[in-house]
């Protein structure tokens, strides 16, 4: 009961951020129906990214239709990703939510990258720019058990360019947190991006 532990530690939870694999078999409607019967999904606002399990049915058919239709998120993503990729403001922070499943080839990644550039630049240039920018996706920045670079290689030049403050990911089931990095090197923290990936709720694969 991870949420129960968090509530006992600090009951002032504003909302919940989920980094993908919300459901075991998200391509099957019954899993979303059962999810929203859970107490915490009634009581807390939450935002999440589409993970690979959120696409898979029990027959291994792939669809994110239920992720899109069962969750009420801003429809401000790019073509083909409305209701799956999205961005929002909370206080002085901007959150940009990505879908790795649509970035498996170069064309898919480039579409996502151009959208991130567009929405972050527009926000930075607005009359009320965010103080912090978070970018969230499911797949890990680094392979936690080896430290080998994963999605970091794809995204770090763009994050450096845009001044993204924090990059959040999941999937690897191992807690990883970098120093603040820019151009592949740790900085004094005044510039660069902090990369964090979260474990599963039971931390089944350890920490690094």
Please provide the spans of the model-predicted regions.
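Acidic-and-aromatic substrate-binding clefts and catalytic sites of carbohydrate-active enzymes
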Residues: 23-29, 104-107, 142-149
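Residue-level marker for buried hydrophobic side chains located in beta-strands
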Residues: 16-18, 48-49, 135, 168
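Conserved acidic residues
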Residues: 14, 131-133, 165
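Active-site glycine-centered loops adjacent to acidic/histidine catalytic or metal-binding residues
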Residues: 20-21, 51-52, 138, 170-171
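Extended active-site neighborhood of metal-dependent phosphoesterases/phosphodiesterases
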Residues: 29-129, 154, 160, 166, ...
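N-terminal active-site segment of His-dependent metallophosphoesterases
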Residues: 1-29
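Short acidic, glycine-rich surface-loop motifs adjacent to enzyme active sites
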Residues: 19, 23, 123-145
């Amino acid at each position: 009961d991870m949420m129960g532990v968090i509530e006992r530690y600090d009951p002032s939870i504003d909302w919940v951020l989920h980094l993908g694999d919300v459901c075991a078999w998200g391509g099957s409607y019954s899993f979303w129906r059962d999810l929203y019967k859970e107490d915490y999904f009634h009581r807390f606002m939450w935002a999440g990214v589409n993970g690979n399990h959120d696409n898979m049915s029990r027959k291994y058919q792939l669809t994110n239709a239920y992720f899109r239709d069962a969750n009420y998120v801003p429809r401000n993503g790019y073509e083909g990703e409305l209701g799956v990729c999205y961005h929002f403001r909370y206080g002085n922070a901007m959150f940009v939510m990505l879908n790795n499943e649509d970035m498996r080839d170069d064309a898919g990644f480039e579409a996502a990258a151009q959208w991130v550039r567009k929405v972050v630049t527009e926000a930075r240039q607005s009359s009320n720019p965010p103080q912090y920018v978070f970018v969230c996706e499911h797949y890990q920045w680094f392979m936690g058990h080896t430290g080998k670079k994963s999605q970091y290689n794809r995204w770090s030049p763009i994050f450096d360019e845009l001044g993204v403050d924090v990059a959040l990911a999941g999937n690897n089931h191992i807690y990883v947190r970098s120093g603040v990095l820019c151009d592949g090197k740790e900085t004094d923290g005044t510039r660069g991006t902090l990369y964090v990936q979260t474990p599963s709720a039971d931390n089944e694969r350890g920490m690094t």
